[in-house]
Amino acid sequence: MGKENLYVWEMTPGMVHENDAAERLLALCGQENMLRSETKEGKIELTAACDGLFRVDSQRLIAVNSREDVMIATRKGNTAVRKGDKLAGMRVIPLIIKEETLQAAEQAAGAGPLLELLPYVKKTAAIVATGSEVKKGLIQDTFTPVVKEKLAAYGIETISIAYSGDGVENVANAIGEARKTGADLILCTGGMSVDPDDNTPGGIQASGARIVTYGAPVLPGAMFLLGYFEDGTPICGLPGCVMYAGATIFDLALPRIAAGVELTRRDFAVMGEGGLCLGCKPCHWPNCPFGK
């Protein structure tokens, strides 16, 4: 072992061994849809048991990690993970820790798990491709295939594609027909800019959706729109950058939407920090700072 001395630890009242302490830290994290490792050298790790959205209660995690002699490290929250991905690791710093110190960490954690892994629940989507030039066949629809591929990565099947043309009424009517398909998610492509004939935002509003945000502090993707219908069905207006950029606001929002999380305006506001794509060549998304 390379050691001149061997040490024997004897149980002392009021002290907790690192292995037992790690189990208690694990209990704070939660394990639904996650798999734990064996306790090794005082450390336990969590991995994903399914594809889904990994979420972290950041403020409570900070509260725990602010206590003395304990640590829980996680991957970034609100990110998509695959089955088998590493999610978190936890341990205490010393070999043995005071019971009162461990209890202080438990109290700081409060009620409920610090971590959660939400499986994707949205299974079907309907796409409304706007623009008269697409409807008339003057240009090829290169937007829809990109969106379908992004949806498929989260297990979402595209069950309907409609070409609305221009005009608020035309877009609204096409959205109404898309809703009749029973799709879990509706996506409108194009027509999201400031030109007079960009009527997609108006069409979405006219369709009866409650608009959460039109615009987001993310580049590329500033002209993104998200709304919800009364039954909870989300609808997105996708700007043209989704068609050609490696990663956009849609890639940040889609995992949450697919997991059934209802986003708020504040959710988008906090995306501003880290919301600037650096345009790296080649693109390394999602292994990059964008959206982190």
Region annotations inferred by a language model:
Residues M1-E100:
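Phosphate-interaction motifs
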Residues E4-Y7, M34-R36, K43-E45, D85-A88, ...:
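Structural motif
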Residues S132, I159-G291:
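Short glycine/threonine-rich loop/turn motifs
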